[in-house]
Amino acid sequence: MKALLDLFKQVQQEEIFDAIKIGLASPDKIRSWSFGEVKKPETINYRTFKPERDGLFCAKIFGPIKDYECLCGKYKRLKHRGVICEKCGVEVTLAKVRRERMGHIELASPVAHIWFLKSLPSRLGMVLDMTLRDIERVLYFEAYVVIDPGMTPLKARQIMTEEDYYNKVEEYGDEFRAEMGAEGVRELLRSINIDEQVETLRTELKNTGSEAKIKKYAKRLKVLEAFQRSGIKPDWMILEVLPVLPPELRPLVPLDGGRFATSDLNDLYRRVINRNNRLKRLLELKAPEIIVRNEKRMLQEAVDSLLDNGRRGKAMTGANKRPLKSLADMIKGKGGRFRQNLLGKRVDYSGRSVIVVGPTLKLHQCGLPKLMALELFKPFIFNKLEVMGVATTIKAAKKEVENQTPVVWDILEEVIREHPVMLNRAPTLHRLGIQAFEPVLIEGKAIQLHPLVCAAFNADFDGDQMAVHVPLSLEAQMEARTLMLASNNVLFPANGDPSIVPSQDIVLGLYYATREAINGKGEGLSFTGVSEVIRAYENKEVELASRVNVRITEMVRNEDTSEGAPQFVPKISLYATTVGRAILSEILPPGLPFSVLNKPLKKKEISRLINTAFRKCGLRATVVFADQLMQSGFRLATRAGISICVDDMLVPTQKETIVGDAAKKVKEYDRQYMSGLVTAQERYNNVVDIWSATSEAVGKAMMEQLSTEPVIDRDGNETRQESFNSIYMMADSGARGSAVQIRQLAGMRGLMAKPDGSIIETPITANFREGLNVLQYFISTHGARKGLADTALKTANSGYLTRRLVDVTQDLVVVEDDCGTSNGVAMKALVEGGEVVEALRDRILGRVAASDVVNPETQETLYEAGALLDETAVEDIERLGIDEVRVRTALTCETRYGLCASCYGRDLGRGSLVNVGEAVGVIAAQSIGEPGTQLTMRTFHIGGAASRAAVASSVEAKSNGTVRFTASMRYVTNAKGEQIVISRSGEALITDDIGRERERHKIPYGATLLQLDGAAIKAGTQLATWDPLTRPIITEYGGTVKFENVEEGVTVAKQIDDVTGLSTLVVIDVKRRGSQAAKSVRPQVKLLDANGDEVKIPGTEHAVQIGFQVGALITVKDGQQVQVGEVLARIPTESQKTRDITGGLPRVAELFEARSPKDAGILAEVTGTVSFGKDTKGKQRLVITDLEGNQHEFLIAKEKQVLVHDGQVVNKGEMIVDGPADPHDILRLQGIEALSRYIVDEVQDVYRLQGVKINDKHIEVIVRQMLRRVQIVDNGDTRFIPGEQVERSDMLDENDRMIAEDKRPATYDNILLGITKASLSTDSFISAASFQETTRVLTEAAIMGKRDDLRGLKENVIVGRLIPAGTGLAFHKARKAKEQSDRERFDQIAAEEAFEFGTPSAPAEEPQHPAE
């Protein structure tokens, strides 16, 4: 019987839909939803607890309280289903209809919807072309608005006060109509003829020239056209009927003690109904206008509060002075419907517990406590018990399980076999934060986790908790097993490195076992095989680190690949190795040579080893190998018995002398400062430099002492060998600690920074072993506290960055195999400061070649365009010395609404070409966001110890070759015969014999060149030197100095050093100059020749002018003779703050938000010749004359540093004024490729500084999403408006349609949007609304009558469909294909029938299913 009853309760099949449309509801629509009008404010009768009739919980309107039972109890049971009781008027049906049925309130006077009024920009204002202020005055009964001016000189939509109105009425009588309140506004809205307005606006747009007007008209046109298209009437923005939410969604719950807990909405609705009823009565009584007006205003306010409390005026508050939660508050923000309930659901069949280490598990297993498993797998156990006949009913089975009879445990074992569970550790920052494992039942209450997966989960065992989830359906189990099993996820999706790398004790054990010692016990013995070595070791005849000769059997790939031949064949060779390494060779997988183990295994080496194993031996062998490495590591670490004590921290003997020398040097600088040879700033810079160098020196001495130890070799001579000091071994192996930390233990702590980032010039000379005195301890607390405060901030910021990144990329999925484009970007090795920071091989690995890769010597094609470049390919390319390869990239992919596999390349987490359906957008966002917490908020390192690199003051060549200067390098020779650089962007290249570039160095302005163009040099030769602490201003011409505008007290100040009494002239800041006149002048030097005439720039009429920047110390006197290349002034560089202006996270966020930097550098808009025009006040005028002879002017603030000189030819997009680059300019002037290179390099710089590896393609994916909108320049015959921003795919589709119809397509400019902006401007309103600014997004979407095609992942999660990625993409594709074939079959049948009966067949319309 129970089963029968359930039949009636079953939910009817959910309708299938492909899109969701949002719009404004007309009053009739609202009435059609409603099941009755709510007339009374009463809720329930508090004596009988029954709902009041016609009240907010009325059973007649909303449905019965109990299933199949009317209110008065006349009809009960199923047999009366659908009957409406004549006594109480309640329909007999399920009680759950109270969640679906709506009511309505007929408003006595229309009311404006606050969202369309107050959500900026005000939509009502746009449609009516009135200001928000005016509309508000009309709505809240402070002013009249003219509706129909008739024959009077008044204008429609004119605002007039009450006084005005009465005067006009006396003057014109009833010739004109003016109203106040929502009725007036509704009249105005009704009187708008949309078609006519759209026509006028379009013509106005074509004819007007003013920017402001174009913007205004375009906005208004967009809204009106949306009304036109969607068929929504503007007057629906004014409500006549108010819908009432179903009562179960705003429940009223009786608490014990006769009180009630209620949803705030009920209070808000009660207020509306009360005021509405009072207004009805007043209108019936024909009350005085002023009373009615006041009541109408109060009604308007009540409805405002219901819809969005606090949006206008004071928020309505409940009894406890707390603002009531309105409908808008229900859906927005972190606790709102979208983020709390739709995107973050709690799930059944899950549990959480503390994790402990499980070293005995296999990689794909986890230990699950028995009691947890019993609870999680309950339904499966019930089923099994029934099937086996242990229990007859589910109830009996339940009892069995509760009593935990022995049979239950046996069945549990059976149930969980082959049934994976998913483990998740919060925060889940990337894909590897959830992995599937096969459960192994264990006693106790903690989950056991395999040590090697800790790195992926970022878990440790200091009390971390993890959650377990059970995949229920067969499909879910299959996906968990094939896609999520831990042993299938051995690579990080961020960079393709192995994620199952050993750490800590495992590393220490392996390192200890593979070290070699001189003169160990049994050194020089020879063994016939590994088993002999093991026997000797077990009998203590040899030590682990002794050098011995062993015959080792390796399994190598078989050359003979014929049918039936074994894949691997044994190969025996004699190796000189150590006992430990020989023993480890037992676990080598077939296919790996012994040479990979024949070295001390540090952490990096082990990682490389596992990587090699993965590439050569495949996934299964690697997983087994990693497991065995782990077992060996733990065993060996235990046997090694490494521990540390105070005496292990050796304080270097030279420390005293090094520190003493430094103190002497500092004293010397103090003396120079006192006698006025250096400025205070220079002194500070130098002192800080000395101490950081000292800190380094002590550290170095300490490491040298720690890292080697004396030892007697076999011949009895003393030599040194690498130390077996425990602390040193821990750091050297990479198990724990770093050189910097050891330096603080046994060297000196060094310089500390104040909270503002400036460095305290007195260092802490003590270390932790000697102990700090009170003052030193006090100084060091600064840095330590700041570190803690930073960490807390950092986590939140990093999480927010990840959220924005995921939001902008969530709809990017691989949807096809190849888009067929031949575009790509040229990849080169990344060189910085002459060093190769990232080799070409790392940048192109796993990419698809965009054009053929050609051997430079033989010109034959090595790899064709479209080939995936794997490890062997990049090794070939590197070996042949090819220095540039064009590869496909996500940025140039031509797939619409997605990406193609070829443009993306290798899926780094799997090591093969990416599959169709992979959600590469989300993976990119996770890869960039996950290491976010490791980035700094500013640059802050070890315990606040200031780690400022001593500033570079020279460059030297790293390799042999020939010096070449770039075209922009210019220099002059001064009187001493030195070559002084006067170009700002010159670079020196070192090329090898074939002319290939080996390294490249920037040579700064004012440097002295030591090698000239064409010089052949050896590695280590200095190319140029310069003073790192000041920046000079140098003259390119000789002559007599003549100062202009150098007036003491006006533009320059005499700085007399308090200590030394010497004076220098310093240029003072414009803002600090007194008179207005002085603000516009710029102190400068002109040069006079022997005749007293101004020296001119050769070939022009311009006199030489050399301007001084603010802060420059002028080093020449008026009338002094100067030679070419002499220094006129020096600008001290900024005081040494800790490196990096905006470093770390804020910098990454700044780049992805595409913010224009303040004081950005200026790029040349065109290619042409530079000249300087007439200066205006405070600005200098720079003119570029392009090739056609047109002039382009730039006004540049005087204090800016101009990088070009008169007569120089610049290319479009070249930097002409120094400063940080503006990404928008780069995109506009240099194109997408340059922009992508800029953003990728800048983001990578930040991560590289922290030693985080992220593949470039992830950043490119984000950049693609930032470029996904374009701005229409000329709309052609399309439906777009010039200046409108539209989705790129949308515009390309429209253009294709135009070309197909022989019409004019639109032209467009690329625009760059920051990630927040891009997320909000996505076509999917559901996704945008769930991100930020919910109200604004929904308001706009409703007016536009937007349709969401559910393309992204987020929208689909929210509406509860399978996401269109991974297996879900296949599902949707199959469903669409089936619908298509069904439709065709249906059409065919219809056509046949029509043919039989001879009726003309109507064309079948495509059924779209927008769910309203």
Curated annotation (Swiss-Prot):
Cofactor(s) this protein cannot do without: Mg(2+); Zn(2+)
Reactions performed catalytically: RNA(n) + a ribonucleoside 5'-triphosphate = RNA(n+1) + diphosphate
Cofactor remark from the record: Binds 1 Mg(2+) ion per subunit. Binds 2 Zn(2+) ions per subunit.
Sequence positions that bind Zn(2+) 1: 70, 72, 85, 88
EC nos: 2.7.7.6
Top-level taxonomic group: Bacteria
SMART domains listed in its UniProt record: RPOLA_N
EC main group: transferase
Function (record text): DNA-dependent RNA polymerase catalyzes the transcription of DNA into RNA using the four ribonucleoside triphosphates as substrates.
Protein family per UniProt: Belongs to the RNA polymerase beta' chain family.
Name of this chain's protein: DNA-directed RNA polymerase subunit beta'
Lineage: Bacteria, Pseudomonadati, Pseudomonadota, Betaproteobacteria, Burkholderiales
